[in-house]
Amino acid sequence: ACTLTPMKTSKAAWKDIFEIALDDLASLVCPRRIVYCEGRDAPGAGGSEKGLDAQVFNNIFSDSFHDTLFVSSGGNTELDQRSDIAIAIFSKIFSELEVLVLKDRDMASGRNTTEQDRVLYLQNNADYHRVLKRWEIENYLYDKEVLTKYCEDKGLVFNEESYDELVNDIENQNLKDVTSRIKSICGITSSINPERFKLNLSEYITEDMAVYNDLASCIFR
């Protein structure tokens, strides 16, 4: 015969119960890696992701890193605060979950940030920090390789000469402010939504491209 006795209500006991109950299910509902990045933190309908950067990263890496989820967490300051809270909470529930913090290289409140500054930042912060090598996400989306591929697929004429005159430093140049000129270089004459345009471009970044490997090396090292 087996005698049942009440469980002692301790944190350790509850942890054991959740590990047993969620063992297989947790791997299905919880990603192996969450990457917090800059962007609009308020969710859309049904909790959908509204931050541009997170949507772009999820588009690019959903196939090759299917167990990774990118989540927008506000601006630079909010990103640090919320990621610290997330790491503290998730590490107690999902021991196998990795949480990373990804920042644009323009993290110094508009001041110029060099590659050396980026390296120093990473050397002097926790290992879960990541910083883009290029200035911000537009410097990847507006890469010549991406725009050429997009134009070829859409039957548009890419003006390479105009592009080379405009983009002289793909890593450090502020390209977010020249979206309308990028659109013209791609031969787009109609009115388009800038955010939708960027999301569409992200669909053309694939594993066989140099820009993909450049971006992936910043995150999955």
Regions from the PLM with identified roles:
Residues 1-27, 210-214, 221:
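Switch/communication elements of ASCE P-loop NTPase nucleotide-binding domains
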Residues 11-18, 80-89, 139-152:
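Short, surface-exposed amphipathic charged segments that create phosphate/polyanion-binding patches used
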Residues 33, 53, 134-138, 198, ...:
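Short runs of predominantly hydrophobic/aromatic residues within well-ordered alpha helices
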Residues 61-66, 152, 187, 206:
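Residue-level recognition of short, structured coil/turn motifs
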Residues 180-221:
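Terminal low-complexity/disordered tails
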